[in-house]
Amino acid sequence: MLRFSDVKYRYYTDLFEFDLNVEQGSVVAILGPSGAGKSTLLSLLAGFIEPESGDITINNESQLSLAPHQRPLSMLFQEHNLFAHLSVAENIGLGIKPNLRLNEKDKKRINDAARQVGVDDLLQRLPEQLSGGQKQRVALARCLVQQKPVLLLDEPFSALDPILREEMIVLIQALIKSEKLTVLMVTHSLQDAKALASHYAFICQQKVLSQGRISELFTQEKPPELTQYLQAVK
């Protein structure tokens, strides 16, 4: 469904080289030490940066000529990126139309997405009136209204306390199932990876060194770099 084929990206003296296959409907935890290239991989997929060679395809269609908003994916960051002067409803509506010229059908999509993530009673509030967990739910609703099949998560739970973190994991588990999403999730938490992911990809030294089912992470023979990483983050 989603493939990085001999993708190369250079940042100053660092050369990133990615080969990765993601099956439709899978949830892939992107693991690896800081600076290894995890967020770089997501940025390449999202179209925020361009590779110098190789191809990135979704359903056998190259994404390289498409602008970020044209790609069949949405992205949830560690920082929720809500606009302080816009209401919750308007922040969600940006996922449909950036100019916020919303018709009744659009407003229904906003209400439906807000209900799915549990913020339908907060639609008229401003971000400053929300808790951290509520802000992240609003950002997730903005992803949902885009109705795109691939969801990218870049350490979305790292700023949340343990209770809110667990609530978000349960919520995203339900949304993955109901919306039939394919997910790539950058995380440093093995607990989050085991809770959400069906597969993993381990990035080290700017390459994908290992990938497989999450159930194999602690049982199969693996590169020494992955063994060392797992011991460090336990």
UniProtKB/Swiss-Prot annotation:
InterPro entries cross-referenced by the UniProt entry: AAA+_ATPase, ABC_SmlMolc_Importer, ABC_transporter-like_ATP-bd, ABC_transporter-like_CS, P-loop_NTPase, Thiamine_ABC_ThiQ
Query: Would the keyword Mitochondrion be found if you checked this record's keyword annotation?
Result: no
Domain ABC transporter as annotated: residue spans: 2-230
Location, primary (coarse class): membrane
Sites where the protein binds ATP: G32, P33, S34, G35, A36, G37, K38, S39
What GO molecular function terms would the record report? ABC-type thiamine transporter activity; ATP binding; ATP hydrolysis activity
* GO CC entries: plasma membrane
Keywords from the UniProt entry: ATP-binding, Cell inner membrane, Cell membrane, Membrane, Nucleotide-binding, Translocase, Transport
First-tier enzyme category under EC: translocase
Name the chemical reaction catalysed here: thiamine(out) + ATP + H2O = thiamine(in) + ADP + phosphate + H(+)
Topology in membrane: Peripheral membrane protein
The protein's location, in the record's own words, is:
Cell inner membrane
Domain of life where this protein originates: Bacteria
Protein EC: 7.6.2.15
How does this chain assemble?
The complex is composed of two ATP-binding proteins (ThiQ), two transmembrane proteins (ThiP) and a solute-binding protein (ThiB).
Any idea what job this protein has? Part of the ABC transporter complex ThiBPQ involved in thiamine import. Responsible for energy coupling to the transport system.
Entries under NCBIfam families matching the protein: PRK10771.1 (NF008039), thiQ (TIGR01277)
The family annotation for this protein states: Belongs to the ABC transporter superfamily. Thiamine importer (TC 3.A.1.19.1) family.
State the protein's name: Thiamine import ATP-binding protein ThiQ
Natural source organism: Aliivibrio fischeri (strain ATCC 700601 / ES114)
